[in-house]
């Protein structure tokens, strides 16, 4: 199973996160995309831990429920493995190799770049373009993941009634979805855009330049910290705390006791991720921050981050320019939109 090889027929994008399964199906007409079907189905606690599937039956059942609720009739899907489960390298290769020869050469040379036995990994590659100052060579992006990581995604989809046609890398799916945001941002050519995806247990920083990912890093921190604090402080179950976090109903003291400290901790984590990027690169600032993920819409977070970093900050909506099928609930979709970046990137693989 290739990690990011485009395949036909049409695909439904399936993002398996630590707390939910997100399904999205798009169509395209006249150069414009339309949301045909979507669903978000919660996962039981610890079914997926730090993006690794632990309880495959529970994940498969959640996919099955989400598929039924979405109303989609597609049975071919694209999913993704987390960046932490993938090794990527940019490797120079002769530009005159055919795809078959290039694939053979990569299989031969992969041992140099992959720290696992080659028969235990799934490999894929993408030609990025000529090497600067040496047009006889091409830069080739090599991606590899332990086969077990890929197989778990494939098996979960199968249990949910879907056939995996593409297993992508989350960072590449994020890059794919970023194309839907690019014209919403007031940044020039060569600007650095930091996309911060704040999930339940992981926060991922992707830095893009001219819509290409130049850096990606994950940090174990996310919305579950706030859910755990609500459980501890107010004596609620995991499900009750998650519901209260989304819909309200907590005591007035919640904002000062739990929410504000969480926002401050989250901003510290984001600042730390950016410092890692600056320390290992030629850059010392970014030009724009885009907040994505389930925590992106926390009231006041963007303004606090903008003040802390001195950089414009917006909340991602990769669906803003898309039309909606009548069967899609617009209000629910708008609320979920910042958390659908990876699902959008995966659904867009239908049109590669």
Q: PLM features: what roles do these ranges have?
A:
Residues 1-109, 151, 163:
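Non-catalytic, solvent-exposed interaction/assembly segments
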Residues 2-42, 75-80, 184-215, 222-225, ...:
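Gly/Thr-rich phosphate-binding beta-strand-loop-beta motif of the actin/hexokinase/Hsp70
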Residues 48, 148-176, 212-252:
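Glycine-rich phosphate-binding loop plus the immediately following alpha-helix
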Residues 63-75, 160, 236, 271-288:
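Phosphate/pyrophosphate-binding loops at sites that engage ATP/ADP/AMP, CoA/4′-phosphopantetheine
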Residues 76, 80-182, 288, 318-324, ...:
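Active-site neighborhood for divalent-cation/phosphate handling
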Residues 228, 232, 241-288, 295, ...:
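Adenine-nucleotide phosphate-binding core of ATP-dependent small-molecule kinases
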Residues 259-262, 284-314, 318-320:
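Glycine-rich phosphate-binding loops at beta-strand->alpha-helix junctions
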Residues 303-343:
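Conserved phosphate-binding/catalytic loops in two-lobed NTP-binding clefts
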């Amino acid at each position: 199973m290739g990690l990011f090889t485009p395949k036909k027929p049409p695909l439904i994008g399936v993002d398996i996160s630590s707390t939910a399964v997100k399904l999205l199906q798009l169509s395209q007409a006249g150069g414009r995309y339309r949301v045909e079907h979507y669903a978000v189905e919660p996962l039981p606690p610890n079914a997926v831990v730090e993006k690794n599937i632990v309880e495959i039956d529970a994940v498969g059942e959640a996919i099955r429920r989400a598929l039924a609720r979405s109303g989609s009739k597609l049975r071919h899907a694209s999913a993704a493995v987390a960046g932490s489960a993938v090794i990527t390298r940019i490797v120079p290769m002769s530009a005159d190799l055919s795809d078959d020869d290039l694939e053979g050469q990569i299989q031969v040379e992969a041992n140099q770049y992959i720290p696992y036995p080659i028969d235990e990994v799934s490999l894929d590659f993408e030609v990025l373009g000529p090497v600067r100052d040496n047009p006889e060579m091409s830069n080739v992006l090599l991606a590899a993941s332990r086969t077990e990581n890929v197989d778990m995604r494939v098996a979960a989809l199968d249990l949910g009634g879907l056939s995996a046609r593409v297993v992508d890398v989350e960072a590449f799916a994020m890059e794919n979805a970023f194309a839907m945001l690019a014209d919403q941002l007031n940044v020039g050519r060569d600007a650095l855009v930091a996309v911060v995806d704040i999930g339940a247990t992981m926060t991922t920083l992707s830095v893009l330049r001219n819509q290409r990912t130049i850096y990606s890093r994950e940090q174990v921190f996310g919305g579950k910290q706030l859910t755990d604090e609500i459980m501890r402080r107010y004596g609620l179950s995991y499900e009750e705390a998650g519901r209260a976090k989304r819909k309200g109903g907590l005591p007035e003291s919640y904002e000062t006791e739990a929410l504000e400290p969480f926002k401050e901790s989250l901003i510290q984590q984001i600042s730390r991720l950016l410092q890692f990027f600056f320390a290992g690169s030629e850059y010392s600032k970014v030009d724009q921050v885009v907040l994505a993920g389930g925590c992106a819409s926390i009231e006041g977070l963007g303004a606090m981050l903008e003040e802390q970093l001195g950089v414009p900050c917006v909340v991602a909506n990769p669906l803003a320019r898309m039309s909606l099928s009548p069967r899609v609930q617009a209000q629910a979709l708008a609320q979920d939109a910042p958390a659908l970046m990876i699902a959008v990137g995966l659904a867009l693989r239908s049109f590669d």
